[in-house]
Design a protein with these regions (language model features):
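Short, charged/polar, Gly/Pro-enriched secondary-structure boundary elements
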Residues: 68-73
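Short alpha-helical segments that sit at the start of domains
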Residues: 1-17, 38-40, 62, 74-75
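Short amphipathic alpha-helical interaction segments
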Residues: 36-49
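Residues within the alpha-helical elements of helix-turn-helix
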Residues: 33
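Minor-groove-contacting beta-hairpin "wing" of winged helix-turn-helix DNA-binding domains
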Residues: 59-66
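A short, conserved structural fragment
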Residues: 49-59
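Short capping segments at the starts of secondary-structure elements
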Residues: 21-29
Length: 75
């Protein structure tokens, strides 16, 4: 299931992950924070990277400018 809906809104899991990524985290840290299975986090993070909302550097995931804007819109 895509994490970004056709209307541009985010699925609830994607919303939760980008809220966690206000500071950089590894996939494992995201799992611990949200109590989700690693496979679900990895697949959602992969889609967020493809959507240019999240970037990965040395195993750490963080928000891009567009991702940070999504967090502001949700707040």
């Amino acid at each position: 299931m895509p994490c970004v809906k056709p209307d541009g809104t985010l699925e609830p899991m994607a919303q939760a992950i980008i809220r966690v990524l206000r500071t950089p985290h590894t996939a494992e840290e995201i799992c611990e924070s949200l109590r989700l299975p690693l496979y679900r986090v990895r697949s959602t993070v992969r889609e967020l990277v493809e959507a240019s909302l999240v970037a990965e550097t040395n195993g750490q995931f963080s928000l891009t400018g567009a991702g940070a804007e999504r967090v502001r819109q949700q707040s």
